[in-house]
Amino acid sequence: MTFKRLALTISLFASASLGHAQSNELNIYSARHYQTDEALYADFTKASGIRINRVDSDDAGILARLKAEGTASAADVILLVDAARLWRGEHDGLFQGVQSTVLEQAIPVQLRSTPDASGKTAWFGFSTRARVIVYDKVRVRKEDVDTYEELGEPKNKGKVCIRSGSHPYNLSLFGAVTEHLGEQQAEQWLRGVVANLARPPKGGDTDQIRGVASGECAIAVTNSYYLARLMHSSKAEDKAVVDKVGVVFPNQSSWGTHVNIAGGAVARYAKNPTNAVKFLEYLASPEAQNHFANGNNEWPTAKGVAINNPALKAMTGGTFKSETVPVSQIGKNQIKVQQMLDRVGFK
């Protein structure tokens, strides 16, 4: 059952199917549509005895549903895949704050929400995905795409492929650039990116990588795990794509590469809040963190967790410098970013 197939008018009835409040249950609304997460849920149930009931949608659909359901919502845990949407859920009053020493010690402060006056935290990031630059190793020199700023420079005119500017992955990147450069300079940069497009924005991140390999463009912006999936693939056509492209983790000499998060929160009207916190604490454990790394090619957020994913290690040697700006601040920049996109004509 997915929200994409359900109208909001029947959401209250669908909520009932998730089960009533019981001490051995947990109801999750999840935007993580990854088959590999099934092992994550199974391991939690095996360790805790808590049965998981889950409904899948996208970030926007989940937030809309929570608003529509109000106090009748069955949701205990909310899992979203974008920092800006987590920020929006917090500021729309859809989450309840959590005090957990386990989570506070495990998750870096910049990858969770700012605590409220009572010291409670609304959401935590449990994995990161880097927004990287992929380039044609024949047509482009690596030193010409070492920074995000270079995406907007004249030397790269007609070379850039990127998905829609209003997609959450790009909104978060643009929000980060705005935080680092300031609004005026960020808008000038966006104008430069638009001027450098090889074609109008279309498709998903994998399409951008394939566009570089096919020669449609020479530079693309993508989340790191899309490239990692191609690197893990046994298909000849995917191997050919990987052979043709190089990857850059931008701004290693300045503020670091932008990372977005997948994170979780306890729903405001959770009927099983204790189980919800147990689940969030489980997501910060080494076992769960390695599920994210090995199952979906994401980087763990918990401190001190070692990973053993060949594709991630091949990209970076296992580590890279990421930005330290709080992801909650990036969410606050979303309105500014959308206005800038409208002004520069970035569709």
Question: What residue spans do the PLM features occupy?
Answer:
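Early extracytoplasmic/lumenal segment of secretory-pathway proteins
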Residues: 22-88, 347
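Short beta-strand->loop
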Residues: 29-32, 96-105, 118-123, 135-137, 143, 149, 236-258, ...
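Periplasmic solute-binding protein
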Residues: 86-94, 116-146, 174-175, 259-264
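Ligand-binding pocket segment of bilobal, Venus flytrap-like solute-binding proteins
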Residues: 165, 169-172, 176-250
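Mature extracytoplasmic/periplasmic domains
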Residues: 262-324
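Extracellular/periplasmic bilobal clamshell ligand-binding domains
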Residues: 308-347
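A structural signal for short loop-to-beta-strand junctions that line the ligand-binding cleft
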Residues: 73-78, 96-133, 149, 160-162
